[in-house]
Amino acid sequence: MEQTWRWYGPNDPVSLADVRQAGATGVVTALHHIPNGEVWSVEEILKRKAIVEDAGLVWSVVESVPIHEDIKTHTGNYEQWIANYQQTLRNLAQCGIRTVCYNFMPVLDWTRTDLEYVLPDGSKALRFDQIEFAAFEMHILKRPGAEADYTEEEIAQAAERFATMSDEDKARLTRNIIAGLPGAEEGYTLDQFRKHLELYKDIDKAKLRENFAVFLKAIIPVAEEVGVRMAVHPDDPPRPILGLPRIVSTIEDMQWMVDTVNSMANGFSMCTGSYGVRADYDLVDMIKQFGPRIYFTHLRSTMREDNPKTFHEAAHLNGDVDMYEVVKAIVEEEHRRKAEGKEDLIPMRPDHGHQMLDDLKKKTNPGYSAIGRLKGLAEVRGVELAIQRAFFSH
C-alpha cells in the first residue's frame, strides 16, 4: 500500500515535515479555500502541488472535490456546478493528480456527537452516541417526525439525557453536529440547518439516487477520458440520519453505482471506520467483491457499544474491525493487479487517530492529531510488512 496522510493545507497544525517524519510518502489534501462548486484552476492546483513536492512528498489523492448541494437536490445552478466539476477534473489530470475521493452525503458530512471522549488510558477519541443524537434531533433541533426514527426506549432515554444537560452541554452537542468537522466544507447555525433539511423534505432515497445518477453520468465519462479515478467515500455513519436519505451505505448501494455507470473510473474509497460500525457487514467480502474498483483506503477501527448504533473510534488494531484480514485482502488485491501488469499501489491513510501524549495539550483538528495517526500508521505498516513477508516474499 502507498502510505499517505491527510493534510488540511498550510493552516494545518500538523506540518508536511511532520508528515514525512511519520513515514508517509503521499499527501491527501484539497483546496479548502475555494468555495464549493467553483473550478479549481490549474494555477491553484500547481501551487498546492509545489508546496507538497517541496517537502519531499507527492500529492497522491484529492480528498475531496466537494459536490455542491444544488447537485444533490437537482435545483438551482446544478448544471453549472456539474460543468465546473468536470473542468476541475480536467485540470487535476493536467497537473498529474488522478485519484479523487468524494462523497454524496446530503447536508452533513461525517457526524459525531463527542469530539473528546476520554478512553480508559486517558487519550481522547471521537464518538457517536445514538441517545445524544436523538436528544439533539428531538429536543434541540425539534425536527418534525423525528420520533419515528427511534425506538420507544431510545425516545425515553433521549428525554432523560436532555433533561440532565446544561446549556453548555446543549451548545457543545449542537456545535459538534452542525458546525462542520474537518473535511466538511459546510457549517451551519441551527436555523440555517433547519432550512437545509427542509430542502430535502421531498427527496427520498430513490430521488437522491436519481440525482446521483445524473452526476455520475456527467462526471464519470470525463474522468475516464482524462484518466482520473473517482473513489466515492461511504456515508458516515452508514445509515439515514435526520430524515435524510443515505445512498452510499451498503453493498447494494455499491452495486447500484457500478450498474448505473459501468466504468472503471467509477470506483470506491474503502473506509473501514465508516462501513465497520455495522455488525452486518463483512469488510473483507466487500474488498474482495469490489477490489478492482477500490482506489483509496481509510484504515481505522470502531467499537460498537451497548446500543448497537453507538460507537467510538477504537485503536487501529483493536475494536470491531479485523485489521489483519482487511490489510491482507487489500494486499492480495494489489498483487492481483501486479499480475495483470499494473504496478500502482493502493493509497492508504490511517484516517483518524486518538488525541494522546503531547497532543492533549495542543489545539488539533478533531480526529486528525499527529501522534495518534503516527501510531496508527506505524501499526498498519507493521501489519502489512508481516503479511508481505509471510505470504508474498517470493
UniProtKB/Swiss-Prot annotation:
Keywords: Iron, Lyase, Manganese
Pathway: Carbohydrate metabolism; pentose and glucuronate interconversion
InterPro entries: Man_deHydtase (IPR004628), Xyl_isomerase-like_sf (IPR036237)
Cofactor(s) named in the record: Fe(2+); Mn(2+)
Known EC number: 4.2.1.8
GO biological process, one term: D-glucuronate catabolic process
GO MF assignments: ferrous iron binding; manganese ion binding; mannonate dehydratase activity
EC class: lyase
Taxonomy, superkingdom: Bacteria
Pfam family, one: UxuA
Reactions it catalyzes: D-mannonate = 2-dehydro-3-deoxy-D-gluconate + H2O
Summary of the function given for this chain in its UniProt record: Catalyzes the dehydration of D-mannonate.
Family: Belongs to the mannonate dehydratase family.
Stated name of the protein: Mannonate dehydratase
Gene name in the database record: uxuA
